[in-house]
Amino acid sequence: GKDQYARLDKISVALPHPDAAAAIIKGGTEITGHFGNPPFQEQELADNPNARIVLKSYDVQGGPGSATVLYATEKFRTESPRTYTAFVNALADAAEFIAAQPEQAADIYLKLTGAKTSRQLLLSVIRNPEVQFNITPQNTLGLGQFMHEVGAIKNRPQVLADYFFDDPRVASGS
């Protein structure tokens, strides 16, 4: 909650997800917890019998949350509209492809990343109803408002347009 939001900061370190997952899977390191995202959190649970779920962002945020948000400046968007549009369209196409072709999406992911993740585990992540692939923001406004309440950001967001560009695909988000 608001009064305890920074309580774990003094015992937290920032690590790339693959490194944190490797530490949890291996066990016996100073890394004993990981605020992860797919597929790393699923790998930890599958490969370390002592790993447990402590909390889920799905429960904390009251539903799905945007696991990844990409940033661009207004200057970039204005000066490079074709590049910006092509990039956002490619993200939307990828999200639609993953939802429509999960098996092929898993194969592409494994081939391009060289990840040692099991195909079956990856498919279970893609098909998990709590994991959604789309470009519509999900439960970001409440998080932004909480961040303002605790002083982590200066301006309190009122609407998505306070921090997302105007785009019909964003308008229905939260």
Residue ranges of predicted features:
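Short, polar/charged alpha-helical segment
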Residues: G1, E44, N139-Q145, Q158
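A local structural motif
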Residues: G1-P16, G27-I31, T117-R119, I153-L160
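Pocket-lining segment of extracytoplasmic ligand-binding domains
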Residues: K10-V13, P18-L110
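Short, solvent-exposed polar/charged micro-motifs at secondary-structure junctions
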Residues: A21-A23, G65, E130-F133, D166-A171
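Residue-level "edge-of-site" marker
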Residues: S57, L123, L160-A161
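Conserved C-terminal helix/tail region of periplasmic/extracytoplasmic solute-binding proteins
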Residues: M147-S174
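Short secondary-structure boundary/hinge segments and terminal tails
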Residues: E44, G62-G63, R127-N128, F164-D166
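Secondary-structure end/capping motifs
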Residues: T78-K154
